[in-house]
């Protein structure tokens, strides 16, 4: 169910996830009382060196301004995707249904279209200038005047449906070493990106032990670093303050301060 939902989210929340993304999967097996984590974060291509990004300026805060925002926008910002290898690892060990059945709902939604959510419409409105930087992205998500779709408007993504169909037929290997891999690498190469066929071929998801924290008598388990799971621990620690002498707003502020000041 988690993998099926993950694929659907890649269709309906394309700015947050998808087959070319990455992340973590925390799995608890109740019959074995065991919790495991799969780390499938994207990794930097081997040829993506720090010195290849031209620095505009370094501000007084933690931000570094890169010329053209090439570390965030465009082909030089693309990491080696991990989602499909992560899903594959989880499915091999814990899956019960065939992978193609788990991908089928996402294929159907991408073909038929879906009403964009309030959150999705807001995100696209805020990033319309970025979505307009390539013809493919602009034609898919923006209107003729480069404005973003409004909540409830229908978006179709038939090319993504085709990609998912290929993955359903041939597995994740087509994305990392097959026809899809060749298409991805050719597109990135002609646009001076860093991702190569070797980056895709060598990518592996990693099984990790979860981080463990006890809060109010409960065992909390989250992905370990490099995830932000430790921030959850920090926030929960702040919530152990004397509730009688702190308002809910103050507790929340203290929790967020502790989380993001580390």
Regions found by a protein language model. Give the residues of each.
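Regular secondary-structure segments
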Residues: 165-168, 240, 260
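Generic N-terminal helix/loop capping motif
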Residues: 8, 12, 238, 259-262
């Amino acid at each position: 169910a988690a993998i099926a939902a993950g694929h659907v989210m890649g269709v309906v929340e394309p700015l947050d996830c998808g087959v070319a993304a990455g992340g973590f999967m925390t799995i608890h097996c109740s019959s074995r009382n065991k919790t495991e984590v799969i780390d499938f974060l994207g990794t930097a291509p081997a040829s993506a060196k720090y010195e290849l990004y031209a620095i505009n300026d370094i501000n007084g805060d933690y931000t570094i301004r890169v010329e053209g925002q090439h570390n965030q926008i465009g082909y030089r910002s693309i990491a080696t995707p991990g989602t499909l290898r992560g899903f594959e690892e989880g499915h091999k060990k814990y899956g019960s249904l065939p992978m193609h059945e788990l991908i089928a709902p996402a294929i159907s939604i991408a073909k038929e279209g879906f009403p964009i959510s309030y959150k999705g419409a807001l995100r696209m409105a805020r990033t319309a200038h970025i979505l307009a930087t390539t013809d493919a992205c602009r034609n898919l998500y923006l209107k003729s005047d480069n404005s973003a779709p409004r909540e409830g408007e229908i978006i179709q993504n038939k090319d993504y449906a085709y990609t998912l169909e290929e993955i359903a037929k041939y597995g994740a290997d087509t994305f990392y070493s097959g026809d899809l891999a060749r298409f991805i690498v050719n597109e990135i190469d002609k646009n001076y990106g860093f991702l190569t066929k070797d980056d895709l071929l060598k990518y592996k998801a990693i099984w990790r032990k979860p981080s463990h924290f006890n809060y109010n008598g409960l065992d909390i388990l989250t992905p370990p670093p490099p995830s932000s799971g430790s921030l959850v621990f920090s926030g929960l620690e702040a919530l152990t303050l004397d509730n009688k002498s702190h308002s809910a707003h103050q507790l929340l502020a203290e929790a967020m301060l502790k989380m993001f000041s580390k």
